[in-house]
Curated annotation (Swiss-Prot):
PSII is composed of 1 copy each of membrane proteins PsbA, PsbB, PsbC, PsbD, PsbE, PsbF, PsbH, PsbI, PsbJ, PsbK, PsbL, PsbM, PsbT, PsbX, PsbY, PsbZ, Psb30/Ycf12, peripheral proteins PsbO, CyanoQ (PsbQ), PsbU, PsbV and a large number of cofactors. It forms dimeric complexes. This is Photosystem II extrinsic protein V. Binds 1 heme c group covalently per subunit. The gene is psbV. Belongs to the cytochrome c family. PsbV subfamily. It is found in: Cellular thylakoid membrane. GO terms for molecular function: electron transfer activity; heme binding; iron ion binding.
Length: 170
């Protein structure tokens, strides 16, 4: 019995020595968020294949602008009014004209058209053309549109199917 208490005492002493060291390391080491790599932040700039690399700060700003201006109907990259048409990469690429690059998304935000590109939906969808009808669009600049477009294109790389998954995922 004495050897049991002796072993227990030695184990507790070791733990009491190691515990403050471990706590000190946990407290003194700041948490670091994972850094996004350049590949994740690089998206098509236009339909000709040019690429643009956004900074993390630009994507964060684009996310904030998107959430305030578009997030009510497009939270998580879905379209609440038509869950068959989301903001996922495949759906954007299949639109006419394709909306899978920054320039074409900015063009859409300025003057939106139907998914098949046949007619304008500016009276039904918030845009710069119809900013008098949609207050969330009134104060947006061209830079805001560019940053939102960057966020829309980077989000599927970061979130995967959680971005724009549509009705099959929700």
């Amino acid at each position: 019995m004495a050897s049991f208490f002796s072993t227990l005492r030695r184990s507790l002493n070791r733990l009491l020595i190691a515990l403050p060291v471990l706590l000190g390391l946990m407290i003194s080491t700041p948490a670091q968020a994972a850094q996004w790599d350049a590949e994740t932040l690089t998206v098509p700039a236009d339909g000709d294949g040019a690429l643009v690399t956004f900074s993390e700060q630009e994507i964060k700003t684009g996310r904030k602008v998107f959430n305030v201006s578009c997030g009510t109907c497009h939270a998580g990259g879905i379209t609440k009014t038509n869950q068959n048409v989301g903001l996922d990469t495949e759906t954007l690429a299949l639109a006419t004209p394709a909306r899978d690059n920054v320039a074409s998304l900015v063009d859409y935000l300025q003057d939106p058209t139907s998914y098949d590109g046949e007619y304008s939906i500016a009276d039904l969808h918030p845009s710069m053309r119809s900013r008098d009808l949609y207050p969330a669009m009134r104060d947006l600049t061209d830079e805001d549109l560019r940053l939102m477009s960057g966020y829309i294109l980077v989000a599927p790389k970061v979130l995967g199917v959680d971005w724009g998954g549509g009705k099959i995922y929700f």
